[in-house]
């Protein structure tokens, strides 16, 4: 029987409970007050179906008319729901508009061999190359939602609706969110309309806000997914170690070789003959081809530059157009050596190319390289036919290249027959812009006249050069200094190319000023580093990317340090790039002459007589001069501004 009165212990317990209840009640009142206040300051989003529906961009790529008809049907379904979406041919769509779109709906068939139909070929190339391009960034399309419906036939087996799946994979790799899973219609299965109607229903509900959508985005690894789809799961195979492949720090996962009946097959062969290896192994080839390279022979490559595409469309040229007067739409970007002696932290390729300190590979004929490079380049230019903005006359000019940037990737002067290759380019009246990484001074000395010869000056001290370039040579600093000195004896145009990386080398202006006396170059190009994504081999972030104003400040300070020998001559704001030029050579009567008279250069080369850089200079147009309101943008071109997303912040214009 319990006691008639509470004990002291029970009384204390009751008091504690009352205090706890009072505390909880006070807290509840406080949090309720805060919640009500937050709701007043931040009203909740309207429930599904009440908010404004995004305006979709509805594209079709039709081969026989089926996809076009389906897109029209989707348009009607959306109209019934109060949403306007007019079907448009993908052939007339500009991929540069993708980052600014809220919602993309795409209906397309699969063409021969699993490829997209011709009407979507340019859009497909743009997406595929952007997805593989480290510079684009995984957040390029982070503001885009999308859904894709494919039209095909299961009779074609594994290529059934392959094009639709590829578009989905590329879009997700660029950060876009897939709100409805890929719809796969079978024209021979008898249920195309049923499958399409079901897919349309989900799209309409998502657009109206009645359904959240699946939300798959770039967090999934699209390329791994592709490899899984293409893998062969035969039970009688086993993986073998791929360590015999001759490469260093290759980005990405190497495909495993297969063993059948005790023999290794496939990916590990490097195509070498008589003990001499090919530079480009199958793994390296696959990695570079994903990035849009066309591999030539066993060690060379060519790739169409985005500025070539830009000027073909009348949207402006690269900084070389502003500084030196090249026609960007007639410029071929190539290299006779994909190998390099450095592993720079800002490498655009994330070290997907081979490395080496000397030539140890099979060597291709220089004339074959030039022929193949021009052939591959013109094929890529031809693919621009029909792209919005490309004019026939520009396309015709682009099919006849007049400039070659030997700066694609790797170290071009490692190629033993570089002089023969240069002679052949000049014989065809193709000017040469060669970039070397300042590790082969003897080869610089033996180079024949180049239209313009660059040396990369990535740091001003031994310690920072080692950190930035990560060179293979132990005597890298001595090689670097000797390379700069080798420029001093060149009569043709020479350039120091500086890439500024905040936190790495942008604070070394006094050291850079001291290096000027070694090579006494005609020009100094100063460019902010291009953000190309982080990886296991590069930890650069957007914090390391300087603003254009930072580059300008650095350039002006370096010009002052030169004591009047150099002045700031030109700028290309879009590329975050500034040019310093020697005053006594290129500033005549107060006007800059940084442009090149290309016809005169070829006359001088053909003559075989000695000549100087002043012998083929030309007047710089006013719009390219430093401080002009155009910022280095050619007023004859049409300015087109893209929306860019690099995760942290967008660069100032």
From Swiss-Prot:
UniProt GO MF annotations: 4 iron, 4 sulfur cluster binding; FMN binding; metal ion binding; tRNA-4-demethylwyosine synthase activity
Radical SAM core domain: residues covered: 324-567
InterPro entries: Aldolase_TIM, Flavdoxin-like, Flavodoxin/NO_synth, Flavoprotein-like_sf, rSAM, tRNA_wybutosine-synth, tRNA_wybutosine-synthase
Co-factor(s): [4Fe-4S] cluster
GO biological process: wybutosine biosynthetic process
Name this polypeptide is given: S-adenosyl-L-methionine-dependent tRNA 4-demethylwyosine synthase
Record's function text: Probable component of the wybutosine biosynthesis pathway. Wybutosine is a hyper modified guanosine with a tricyclic base found at the 3'-position adjacent to the anticodon of eukaryotic phenylalanine tRNA. Catalyzes the condensation of N-methylguanine with 2 carbon atoms from pyruvate to form the tricyclic 4-demethylwyosine, an intermediate in wybutosine biosynthesis.
Entry annotated with the keyword Ligase: no
Segments forming domain Flavodoxin-like: 56-204
Catalytic reaction annotation: N(1)-methylguanosine(37) in tRNA(Phe) + pyruvate + S-adenosyl-L-methionine = 4-demethylwyosine(37) in tRNA(Phe) + 5'-deoxyadenosine + L-methionine + CO2 + H2O
Name of the gene encoding the protein in the UniProt record: TYW1
Record Pfam families: Flavodoxin_1, Radical_SAM, Wyosine_form
Record family assignment: Belongs to the TYW1 family.
Pathways involved: tRNA modification; wybutosine-tRNA(Phe) biosynthesis
Keywords: 4Fe-4S, Iron, Iron-sulfur, Lyase, Metal-binding, Nucleotide-binding, S-adenosyl-L-methionine, tRNA processing
Family matches, as SUPFAM superfamilies: Flavoproteins, Radical SAM enzymes
Record region (Disordered): 211-276, 630-653
Binding sites annotated in the UniProt record for [4Fe-4S] cluster: 340, 344, 347
Cofactor binding note: Binds 1 [4Fe-4S] cluster. The cluster is coordinated with 3 cysteines and an exchangeable S-adenosyl-L-methionine.
Residues passing through the membrane, by range: none
Acidic residues composition bias: residue spans: 221-249
Binding site for FMN: 62-66, 148-180
EC number of this enzyme: 4.1.3.44
